[in-house]
Regions:
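Structured, non-membrane catalytic/scaffold regions adjacent to prosthetic-group chemistry
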Residues: 2-234
Length: 234
């Protein structure tokens, strides 16, 4: 196990201790999936094992790319009919979408009611036209594991990636997405743990076979379902 994974596990354990009282109270009374009123998907708003934060904690690999909108591009390829490289201008010319959704981090915190603006992932898929045998997506960020050329990657089933609330966002709460949170563009996956949404997104590949990403190769769950407490590979 590398140092990065050990640090992340220690962080999670600290969060559990800091919020032990509220978690213990909830655990005695909440349904197995979580607590709170049903969200728009019919599940408890707060997934099991999570606590609510009002700020937006920053977590990364230790590499925070400084990519201007003039430099930023999104390469989209793999098994598609029309591979493209989008500039910032191209990206903003695509149909824009707004959504309000919750953000669930595997490190046990959730932030509710985030107002996003960006491009739905399904719009990207429609643009490039995946081949019939495509079942998976691999997203790659501009960031790398420090001291290496290993980029951040994460995998998502195509069926999940093209859901209505999966976006490539450039705006949060009415302001440009902050650099520390993945700006100028990051992916968000509201029904999965947030590591499934690559920050500083740079490339998307459409694949026939699943390919595990950075954290998935290091012991994190491949499916990442917050309401199943699905944090680590079994």
């Amino acid at each position: 196990m590398d140092d990065l994974v050990e640090r992340r596990i220690r962080y999670i354990e600290r969060q559990k201790l800091l919020h032990k009282e509220s978690v213990d109270v909830d655990a005695a009374s909440q349904p197995a999936m979580g607590s709170g009123q049903p969200n728009r998907h019919g599940k408890p708003q707060l997934p099991v094992g999570q606590h609510v934060v009002r700020n937006w904690p920053v977590l990364d690999l230790g590499d925070v790319p400084d990519i201007s909108t003039d430099e930023w591009t999104l390469e989209v390829g793999g098994l598609v009919e029309n591979p493209v490289t989008l500039t910032w201008k191209d990206f903003l010319a695509l149909p824009q979408a707004e959504d309000v959704s919750d953000f669930h981090c595997v490190t046990t915190w959730s932030r509710f009611d985030n107002h996003w603006k960006g491009v739905r992932f399904r719009t990207i898929a429609e643009l490039v036209v995946p081949q019939p045998d495509v079942r998976h997506v691999l997203a790659t960020g501009y960031d790398h594991m420090p001291g290496t050329r290993i980029p951040y990657t994460t995998n998502v089933p195509l069926a999940r990636a093209i859901e209505e609330d999966v976006l490539l966002v450039h705006t949060w709460q009415g302001e440009p997405l902050p650099r520390e949170h993945g700006g100028p563009v990051r992916m968000i996956t509201p029904k999965l743990y947030a590591w499934k949404g690559a920050k500083w997104i740079h490339r998307v590949d459409f694949l026939a076979q699943d390919q595990k990403g950075f954290w998935e190769l290091r012991g994190y769950s491949n499916t990442a379902e917050p309401w199943a407490n699905d944090r680590y590979a079994s």
